[in-house]
Amino acid sequence: MNYKVVEKFVSINGEGLKSGQLSVFIRFAGCNLNCNYCDTKWANEKDVKYTLMTEKEILSYIKETGVKNVTLTGGEPLLQDGIVELLNLLSLDSTLRVEIETNGSVSLENFLNFKNAPSFTMDYKLPDSSMENFMKTSNFKFLNKKDVIKFVVSSLKDLKKAMDIITEFNLSKKTNIYISPVFGRISPETIVDFMKDNKLNDVTLQIQIHKIIWNPNKRGV
């Protein structure tokens, strides 16, 4: 199987449970959503340049880096043709810790039964993204404490909706919850004040540290 890879690189993980740790990133082309704040829209364009790589070539590249954390991202990695075959191959290497960044619109059910199963960082798209109608709340039951559900917020309206979802589905008992500001649209201070005012326990404010270290628009970091 060939996969459309638009980027592959080693950097620190800018967010999530492994924030600040080295990771090897594999970014795939194409996404089924069109979030208005997306910082990788270029990877979803029809004419984006990509390299076709087999699962064995991807694994070989990962092993050559010597990095154990692996982040599959996009685009939407779970929509890649043959992604189960790639995940199965990666799962056979017990030294690798595979994380999948997924947008919340694809069912996770078919991606759980691996010996060395990947972890998920799953978005829940909020109203300001204009993509909330595509969210699959049925995915919540598949998440556990090695996973993350991420709420990317642009406004107080988004924060209130995130709080409603966290409460309705009792998410803090199931998985890790991160709230991340859309860069340049809402201040971290506003989020902290909201968390304090609403007693949001077991919720983590996440700042994308790669956008602090490098230019926010820089690729390959």
From Swiss-Prot:
S-adenosyl-L-methionine binds at residue 75. Binds 1 [4Fe-4S] cluster. The cluster is coordinated with 3 cysteines and an exchangeable S-adenosyl-L-methionine. It is an enzyme of class 4 (lyase). Pathway: Purine metabolism; 7-cyano-7-deazaguanine biosynthesis. InterPro entries: 7-CO-7-deazaGua_synth_put_Clo, 7-CO-7-deazaguanine_synth-like, Aldolase_TIM, rSAM. Pfam families: Fer4_12, Radical_SAM. Gene3D superfamilies: Aldolase class I. SUPFAM superfamilies: Radical SAM enzymes. Mg(2+) binds at residue 40. Its cofactor is [4Fe-4S] cluster; S-adenosyl-L-methionine; Mg(2+). The keyword Lyase applies. It comes from the Bacteria. GO terms for molecular function: 4 iron, 4 sulfur cluster binding; carbon-nitrogen lyase activity; magnesium ion binding; S-adenosyl-L-methionine binding. Substrate binds at residues 12-14, 27, 73. Keywords: 4Fe-4S, Iron, Iron-sulfur, Lyase, Magnesium, Metal-binding, Queuosine biosynthesis, S-adenosyl-L-methionine. [4Fe-4S] cluster binds at residues 31, 35, 38. One of its GO terms (biological process) is queuosine biosynthetic process. It catalyses: 6-carboxy-5,6,7,8-tetrahydropterin + H(+) = 7-carboxy-7-deazaguanine + NH4(+). Homodimer. This is 7-carboxy-7-deazaguanine synthase. The gene is queE.
